[in-house]
Amino acid sequence: MHRSINSILPWNLLFFVSALVLLGCATAQYTTRTNNLSASPSPAATIAQEESGAINRPTSKPYAGELSIFEDPKRDEKLQPNRIMDILGVKQGSNVADIGAGSGWFTVRAARRVGNGGIVYAVDINREYLDYIEKRSKRERLINIRVILGKEDDPLLPQKGVDALLLLKTYHEIAQPIRLLKRTRAAMNAEALLGIIDRNGKGDDHGVDKEVVIKEAERAGFMLVNQYDFVKPDNVDYFLVFRAAR
């Protein structure tokens, strides 16, 4: 004959075992709720992220190699700098910013166009590149170039002092693009235009999808006014033009 467990175990031991089972269930439910809460950012964390301009995507390591790659004779044909400057409204007397200036490829071309009545700010976070641009400007007798050692999130441009800005194949390297764009906007005159030339990519492959750039620029207070594909027309490179939203 089989006897039930109630007849085998004392009632107080049964009570103890039951209590342990209930405690285990409650602990499991609490752990699950805690894990679910930790998986989702708190409202405060989300607000802090928005205010800081943080992004959640990969970026490329800033280029720090030889500058000769920027001086390919075919680059003018591919990128059409004069057409870029026409679109951005660069003319005699304009103040222009070349953010991520590198070898100064665009800097010197803009300096020739704006003449001695204008200024071209060559901004880079690499001191060696700026030294190269200073030597180049002296060699080419361009007295209207000013070099600026910027920060990763701030080009350190003069407030309301720029008529046109260009980020040429630089945006995919910027770790805090929204913060940098906000500080760039502060340097722009009322009618100034910002041009961003880059290539479609994943962020860490020296490219970033243009739709990502547009959304981040909008978060920073810009509005898209036009886009072009004449810079290396290969369905990869793009040229976006923004102005500060009013």
Predicted regions and their residues:
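A short acidic, Gly/Pro-enriched loop at the edge of an enzyme's catalytic core
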Residues: 155-165
